[in-house]
Structure formats: C-alpha cells, structure tokens
A protein has these predicted regions:
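CheY-like receiver
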Residues: 120, 125, 130-160
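Hydrophobic/aromatic residues positioned on beta-strands within the core alpha/beta folds
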Residues: 88-91
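Receiver (REC) domain active-site loop signature in two-component systems and cognate sites
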Residues: 64-65
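Acidic, metal-coordinating helix/loop segments flanking the phosphotransfer/catalytic sites
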Residues: 20, 36-57
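Active-site residues of response regulator receiver
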Residues: 10, 61
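Two-component/phosphorelay signaling modules centered on CheY-like receiver
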Residues: 13-38
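A Lys-centered signature of the CheY-like receiver
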Residues: 114
Length: 160
C-alpha cells in the first residue's frame, strides 16, 4: 500500500523549513509535501487523487497571499475526494471571529497558534494521522510507531 500523504502549506519559507524539521519523525511512514501557496497545494491534491492515494492531513497557514488558508481548507472540505482528510490550521494573527469562521467554514480539526511548541504540534499531527488511519480502515499495525497510542486505544476499545 502507498504511504498516506501530508500536505503543508505556508507562504513563509522559514515556516516550511520548521515544518520539514519537525515532521521528520513521520517521514518513514507518510509522504510529506511542502507548498508555498494554495494553488501549488491544489496541484498536489490532484496528483494524490490521480494516483488513488490517501491524503491524511493538511497543515495550512491562515494568512497567505491570494487564497487564505480558511478558503483553501473550506474548498478541500467541500471536495468529495478529500472530505475525510484531517485539517490543521496554523496562524499567528487570527482573531476570535477568524477562528470561529475556520471551524464553521473549513471544518478544521485542530488549530495551532504561531509560534507553537514542538511537542504539542507533533502530538496534534500524530492524533490527526491516527484518527484518519482508523476512520479509513487502513491497517494501523504498519504505523504503530507514529500513531497516538491514547487515541488508538480509545478508538479500539470503543469498537469492541
């Protein structure tokens, strides 16, 4: 089976470099793409779909030139091909209203403020990946090293 995919979208190269460093932990188990715009990410979405692969998580900045992260994640949420994809919004400038809009419009699963604490960020990604793998019925045994054990235990306990 092909590795699940994660897409990271941020217009700031230093943030993408930080994401690349922090997500290194997952690289053996998932393919990770780094995009500087929503347009670039949309091309990756089409490639993933054309190959019939899983898009597990999108990590996206909120404030970007052109299409905002909320707009982009809203479009992904409305795209039947990726409705089960987990969405994490990164932002350093969001107001309370922005956050509410992101939850309502884009159905984000997690929110991380910039700057973030590395351990907390990795745990959020780990939890989202775990939820996706379980919801899609992917054999989780291949991914045990990178999955969130508490989420895995809770979900498996509730299904038996």
């Amino acid at each position: 089976m092909a590795k699940p995919n994660i897409i990271c979208v941020d217009d700031q190269r230093d943030i993408l470099a930080t994401l690349k460093k922090e997500l290194q932990f997952f690289r053996e188990y998932v393919k990770i793409f780094y995009c500087e715009s929503a347009d670039e990410a949309e091309n990756i979405l089409d490639e993933i779909d054309a190959k019939g692969e899983h898009l597990a998580v999108i990590i996206c900045d909120h404030v970007m030139p052109g299409k905002s992260g909320v707009e982009f994640l809203g479009e992904v949420n409305n795209d039947i091909r990726f409705q089960k994809t987990k969405k994490l919004l990164l932002t350093g400038l969001a107001t309370h209203e922005d956050t509410i809009e992101a939850i309502n419009k884009a159905k984000i699963d997690r929110y991380v403020g910039k700057p973030w604490e590395t351990h907390d960020f990795i745990n959020k990604v780990r939890t989202l990946l775990t939820e996706y793998i379980l919801e899609e019925g992917i054999d989780y045994n291949e991914f045990l090293t990178v999955l969130d054990q508490d989420t895995l235990y809770t979900r498996l306990r509730n299904t038996t």
